[in-house]
Amino acid sequence: MAQVAGKKLTVAPEAAKPPGIPGSSSAVKEIPEILVDPRTRRRYLRGRFLGKGGFAKCYEITDLESREVFAGKIVPKTMLLKPHQKDKMTMEIAIQRSLDHRHVVGFHGFFEDNDFVYVVLELCRRRSLLELHKRRKAVTEPEARYYLKQTISGCQYLHSNRVIHRDLKLGNLFLNDEMEVKIGDFGLATKVEYDGERKKTLCGTPNYIAPEVLGKKGHSFEVDIWSIGCIMYTLLVGKPPFETSCLKETYMRIKKNEYSIPKHINPVAAALIQKMLRSDPTSRPTIDDLLNDEFFTSGYIPSRLPTTCLTVPPRFSIAPSTIDQSLRKPLTAINKGQDSPLVEKQVAPAKEEEMQQPEFTEPADCYLSEMLQQLTCLNAVKPSERALIRQEEAEDPASIPIFWISKWVDYSDKYGLGYQLCDNSVGVLFNDSTRLIMYNDGDSLQYIERNNTESYLNVRSYPTTLTKKITLLKYFRNYMSEHLLKAGANTTPREGDELARLPFLRTWFRTRSAIILHLSNGTVQINFFQDHTKIILCPLMAAVSYIDEKREFRTYKLSLIQEFGCCKELASRLRYARTMVEKLQSSKSAVAHVKASA
């Protein structure tokens, strides 16, 4: 019987009944709404669905006594019938419960009933670096340093405790509300029992698999260094080093060490990647060597990052800040194209190469072509006409948008369109195609000129040429506070907020039945007037969020809707969306208010 530190994992005998026989628990049991730990008598309320992976489903769970919120990983015992499955689960729990580090997902206990095993973990609300990567592709060098430093710190702790993670990848590097990295998912992890032990077997396929694992030569801590090399490459280049469309070809490239680093990558960064991706595991740096590399010692590492970095690049003003904030002049960013990290005129970052233009640039149509293609493919399969529709299987909460428009007011006959984002920041797209945004602190401002050049100011210090626009912005903000929203107190500024950049409203138009809004991060939102339903489309995540008449907010992957189908209501809105995206794309000037009627 599998055992975790004196506590057995039991699988009820009836779970082994063959399928199709009445009473067989091979039919998936309903997960209870209240989860009870029989040992401590703690009770948890099962809340929002967070996602699924492997055998497990993950939910937000709330301790009914302390009101603390956790992530509950729930595994049906029907999936733990074979000894190796049970042993794997036992090992995962045993390893994770032995760990306690700032950059490792916190373990808060586990328990079971007849049907499920429940693991109580730290909740990471900002998902993982995988979603960030899908939205951002390549990140700026200071951001890469920030995420890598924390990942290495967590991995140092694992290695010092003789744990090899064996599946370090973007999807297993989770982010909390403070944008701190937490290493999670110890399903493939193992413990080194004695010095020099080489592990021979590995159940499962790691994402960034090292050549010595493929060669079955025995492996150890060096596999995690290889994975960190792949992570660093992916963060800076925007795609994994050995990626091909065919797994066999990818493995061949790994074995041959066949990859190339684009010329625009800083040579210091390229050198560190090359060291970590050496075929010979003994010639790779150890985890303790990494943070002493020039890449980390010579470059700027932000102490905090704003959550806006999940979808748009940050602005780097001063590293570290030495100027009294009250004396700072408004900072104006040099416009280098929308996807380049913004350089501010006042102070340059530590290294010139940090600001080099990424190899790819954001498409001129802001991902409308991709969205059109995605919607065309989806609508072609007629998802609401399937014989069996299982819309809930298409749900993917990890793809939930970072920003959407929560309120808007149309004054375009005189001034422009005012709107509020879900984080309570407020913006106006003026009729002259300029934009002004006030952050949710009620003080910071972002001004975007017609040519997309961005400037950063505050309500206490701005050029007189902007006086009228700032007065109008405040008017819009007050109007929406009084008439359209629950007035909320200003949020307290936190460290890292000075690096925030918000997506802005790129273009919009109204039809008889809806308003269509296109944000600069690629998101398209359609609000339907009659029933107040909304859809929010993200081409980078290839996902749609649907807010129905009951104001329930659910996010689906478009590819999974193709596979599992969807209700007629969502299908008709997705057909309408395709027509609207086509209209957005064909408008000659997709940077302001498009006149339309449909």
Swiss-Prot record:
Top EC class for this record: transferase
Effect on the protein of changing S340D: No effect on activity
PTM annotation: Activated by phosphorylation on Thr-201 during M phase. Phosphorylated by stk10, leading to activation during oocyte maturation. Ubiquitinated by the anaphase promoting complex/cyclosome (APC/C) in anaphase and following DNA damage, leading to its degradation by the proteasome. Protein levels are down-regulated by proteasomal degradation in anaphase.
Catalytic activity: L-seryl-[protein] + ATP = O-phospho-L-seryl-[protein] + ADP + H(+); L-threonyl-[protein] + ATP = O-phospho-L-threonyl-[protein] + ADP + H(+)
Domain Protein kinase as annotated: residue spans: 44-296
Entry binding sites for ATP: 50-58, 73, 122, 169-172, 185
Listed EC numbers: 2.7.11.21
Residues with the Phosphothreonine modification: T10, T201
Effect of T205D: No effect on activity
Result for mutant: S128A: No effect on activity
Region of interest (Linker), residue spans: 487-501
Residue span of motif D-box that targets the protein for proteasomal degradation in anaphase: 328-331
InterPro entries cross-referenced by the UniProt entry: Kinase-like_dom_sf, PLK1_cat, POLO_box_1, POLO_box_2, POLO_box_dom, POLO_box_dom_sf, Prot_kinase_dom, Protein_kinase_ATP_BS
Keyword terms: ATP-binding, Cell cycle, Cell division, Cytoplasm, Cytoskeleton, Kinase, Mitosis, Nucleotide-binding, Nucleus, Phosphoprotein, Repeat, Serine/threonine-protein kinase, Transferase, Ubl conjugation
Family to which this protein belongs: Belongs to the protein kinase superfamily. Ser/Thr protein kinase family.
Protein name: Serine/threonine-protein kinase PLK1
Species, as recorded: Xenopus laevis (African clawed frog)
Gene: plk1
